[in-house]
Regions:
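Intrinsically disordered, low-complexity segments enriched in Gly and acidic/Ser/Thr residues
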Residues: 232-235, 325-382
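A short, solvent-exposed, low-complexity linear motif enriched for acidic/polar residues
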Residues: 1-231, 236-241, 250, 258-260, ...
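Single-stranded RNA-binding regions, centering on S1/OB-family and related RNA-binding modules
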Residues: 255
Length: 419
């Protein structure tokens, strides 16, 4: 889900001999979480997935596809960046009710990977910037102006803070208040970082946002079911951070399905605004300050602090109790619908796990301004919202909705990628 709108950093290579190279990718044992919206039961690696169910399966597919359409010519003392585009749709097939994955489908089927050099056209980056890595979440350590974020699910990101780096306040407003500097960054915080990939392969902090003051059990996921009568919802786990000691969630993995029980007296819900002026919208209160599961909707991404944990069994999902629920960033691909302006984008045909009528249109709030500025929507492939064309767009946005599904706007975009 993350790579629909965002980019992951795979690393930097040094001392590459001069020559011409192809790119080969090694993949194995993919875990896939999906909503079976086909109307019939699906079988995946021997596991049955009923119609209308959300299922998590690990497949045995493996492969080392070579991206034949791309070659890299390395010369002495040159610095180059390469980006890979992974098209999961081209790897998945459904035949006679059986779901399978092939990372190297035979011609004339479309390839799973394409590659290109960086920076991309209309990437809206500055001098010596190749790409922007966004929302890398983990535990903070600090050495001078160098910030390290360690994630149990995504590895480690090391980036240098500069005078151009932004520091957003935490969702509860207690950490890094307005006009903060790196002095508000403390070891042991849970934080989200955006970082520029520089032409020399190093990373520079664009934006730092603390999420928790201390390292504790913290789980993020995509909501797919809500029961407001029982103060309960279900989600697919997309990220986690474990407490420094005595973690309850060591056996919980990304891709697992999880039941979340809201505590009897929870903290008022928070919204991770990431510097966007979301608070000024009437939609903000649909989530912020609430304490009931009725404020939560399928398709939202939320983070929860874990106070109790019960492991999964063969018949029941793993379950946690949480006293703190924070709205974070939904990532999805949808159809862009005209008209397009610098401030508003209309979309329909959202993914089926939102459980919304495909033809229904929803308004996405955009935040125009100087590219790379604080509180501004990042655009990839277009200069601003007025350049959007009626093709699919991938969006990372806050989803703020009411019980009648009439919020306008319903989405507040930190990122828009034009396809």
């Amino acid at each position: 889900m993350r790579l629909q709108s965002d980019t992951a950093f795979l690393g930097a290579l040094t001392n590459v001999p001069s020559g011409t190279y192809t790119v080969q990718v090694s993949l194995s044992n993919p875990e896939i979480v999906f909503l079976n919206d086909t109307g019939s039961t699906i079988t995946a690696n021997g596991k049955m997935c009923a119609a209308g169910a959300v299922c998590s399966v690990t497949l045995t597919a493996a492969g080392t596809p070579t991206i034949s359409s791309f070659t890299l010519t390395a010369t002495a003392n040159s610095q180059q960046g390469i980006e890979l585009d992974f098209k999961l749709k081209n790897a998945i097939s459904l035949t006679s009710g059986a779901l399978s994955v092939n990372f190297n489908p035979a011609s004339p089927n479309p390839g799973v990977f394409t590659a290109f050099t960086l920076p991309r056209t209309n990437a809206n980056l500055g001098t010596n910037q190749l790409e922007l890595i966004e929302d890398f979440t983990g535990v903070v350590s600090l050495s001078g102006s160098t910030v390290t974020i360690t994630s149990p699910t995504r590895g480690t990101l090391i980036a240098k803070s500069t005078s151009n780096s932004f520091f957003d306040h935490s969702p509860d407003g207690a950490i890094c208040p307005t006009t903060s500097t790196i002095t508000c960054v403390k070891a042991g915080q849970i934080a989200s970082v955006d970082a520029f990939v520089k032409s020399d392969g190093t990373l520079e902090v664009k934006e730092f946002e603390p999420l928790n003051a201390t390292q504790k059990d913290f789980v993020e996921g995509i909501v797919y079911g809500v029961s407001s009568t029982t103060q309960q919802f279900t989600m697919a786990v997309t990220d986690k951070v474990q407490a420094a000691t005595n973690s309850l969630i060591g056996g919980l993995n990304t891709g697992d399905l999880l039941t979340v029980n809201i505590a009897l007296a929870p903290n008022p819900f928070f919204v991770d605004s990431k510097g966007l002026s979301v608070q000024s919208s009437s939609s903000y209160s649909f989530f912020a300050g609430q304490t009931s599961a009725s404020a939560i909707h399928p398709g939202q991404t939320v983070a929860v602090n874990v106070t109790t944990f019960v492991a999964a069994t063969s018949t029941t999902l793993a379950a946690v109790t949480s006293d703190t629920v924070t709205l974070r960033w939904s990532r999805f691909t949808a159809a862009a619908v005209a008209p397009f302006t610098t401030q508003l984008l209309n979309v329909n045909t959202l993914p089926s796990y939102f459980f919304l009528t495909p033809a229904s249109q929803f308004v996405v709030q955009l935040y125009p301004g100087t590219a790379g500025g604080q509180g501004i929507t990042n655009f990839d492939g277009i200069t601003d919202g007025s350049g959007i064309v009626p093709n699919p767009v991938s969006v990372r946005a806050l989803f703020l909705e009411n019980t009648g599904i009439t919020a306008n706007p319903a989405f507040f975009a930190a990122k828009v990628r034009q396809h």
